[in-house]
């Protein structure tokens, strides 16, 4: 369960970084 949340956060963070660029 925690692994899934961490993966989701990582993906969201990467998305934010890509959108911010």
Swiss-Prot record:
What GO cellular-component annotations does this UniProt entry give? Answer: extracellular region
Q: Where found, per UniProt?
A: Secreted
- UniProt keyword Cell wall biogenesis/degradation, yes or no: no
Q: What is its main location?
A: secreted
Provide the GO MF annotations for this entry: toxin activity
Tissue specificity, please? Answer: Expressed by the venom gland.
Keyword list, A-Z: Amidation, Secreted, Toxin
| PTM sites of type Serine amide | 21
UniProt family annotation:
Belongs to the cationic peptide 04 (cupiennin) family. 09 subfamily.
Protein name, as recorded: Cupiennin-6a
Q: From which source organism is this entry? A: Cupiennius salei
């Amino acid at each position: 369960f925690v692994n899934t949340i961490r993966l989701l956060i990582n993906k969201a963070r990467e998305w934010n970084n890509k959108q911010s660029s």
